[in-house]
From Swiss-Prot:
InterPro entries: ATPase_NBD, Carb_kinase_FGGY, FGGY_C, FGGY_N, Rhamnulokinase. Its EC number is 2.7.1.5. Keywords: ATP-binding, Disulfide bond, Kinase, Magnesium, Nucleotide-binding, Rhamnose metabolism, Transferase. Pathway: Carbohydrate degradation; L-rhamnose degradation; glycerone phosphate from L-rhamnose: step 2/3. This is Rhamnulokinase.
Amino acid sequence: MKKEQVEKRTYLAVDIGASSGRIMKSQRLANGQITIEEIHRFKNGFHQKDGYQRWDMASLVHELLLGLQKVKQLGIKECFIGIDTWGVDYCLLDQSGQLLDEPIAYRDGRTEAAVTNFSKGYSLEKLYQQTGIQVQPFNTIFQLFVEEKERLAAASQLLLIPDYLGYVFTGKAVIEATNASTTQLLNAGTKQWESELLDFLGIDETLFPTLVEPGTILGDLQTAAFPDYDLPNATLITIASHDTASAILGTPGIGDDWAYISSGTWSLLGIETTVTTISAEAFQENYTNEWGAQNTIRFLKNIMGMWLIQEVARHQNYQYSYAELAALAEKEPAFQQFIDVNDPRFLNPGNMITELQAYCRETQQTVPESPGELARCIYDNLALCYSVELEKLAQLTGIERKITTLHVVGGGSNNRLLNQLTADVANVTVNAGPGEAIALGNLLMQMIATGELKDIPAARTCIQTSFPTEIYQANPIDSTIKNRYQAFMKRSSL
């Protein structure tokens, strides 16, 4: 293809999170840089139906079609599309290939006792040794453990959320491997479905379609199936469809002295490596080995993240923006309370404000009352948690290299207070941005698939030259604060 034709290739990243989704358009310029532009944004969320919290897949499909229609109206007649979403949730198809019912959201309470009950018949240590994935009650394996047997019996196929959307648009059913690793059903060594786990669940392997790697050409958008929409000609590419996998691919890390935090509803803190770390210590610390693009491993810890402040803002009826909450927090004294940000009680409480206050009351601490105090409590403790986990990361992997740079990407990278706190508490340089790392990772994987970019290092160089980042140098805090925090965490775990 001629150079001028390559420059005009249009790529679309469909990036859907728990609360919103968007379609981002990108092209690669002659100077090697890439552009990125939001074309369509829409709300997402789960709703109560038939006793469960569910995702509205029909609404998501409709919004994506509206966005693609906007793309066509911009004069773009041909494009490539990649889809990423959150992990672990799944759609069940009936014998005719239609959705059995709306998929149940991972925050639904149905799996509250799943880990305990599962462990009565299957060792959690063995589960970790087989899969390398941290034990979390909402993982696909535990959702399937509590799934209604009648629904499973009626299902012909199981598709993860991005794969279902790809199936709707192309008619091709696959499961993308990086996202499949979050199911906790794949063997870390063989990279195939673990038959012993499937037997324990009473599930046949035929329920799962073919596993494919990121960069696989899925197929063309079946425009004839959507006559009510004026759509462009599009080719779907299966990218690293778990949003964290795309975010890390979209992180501008060079060399081997860096770690990352993909900062959004969850904070995913880890390193990129090529080997799994499956040990008794990693199991105890609940670290995970999720698969990444091009044979990489994301060894990371899931931390509750911006969910805490999102829920505080929601229960204040969004009286304050996130920037305003951070500004209020900055005026408050630091480290007045210690909390375990990963305590399960914060996963989906009725009211995050009262839950945080109850936690502080129960642990005989000063109770945060004002919006600024609540925000300060959250940001201080996220920074403390990040710092402790960075140390554990080095210990668990036995890495000789010193982590000198922490790349913070995603929406949370815009939080200047938290970035500086993290640099200070962890005593590392924080490199914040790009905020659009998920969409960028999605887009760049497409460009690798089409041959516009050679590999992941080339993609990251492209990010560095295209998007500025903000550097936060460390002003180390009094070490006794961190010592007190760690002592508190040790007591609270007893």
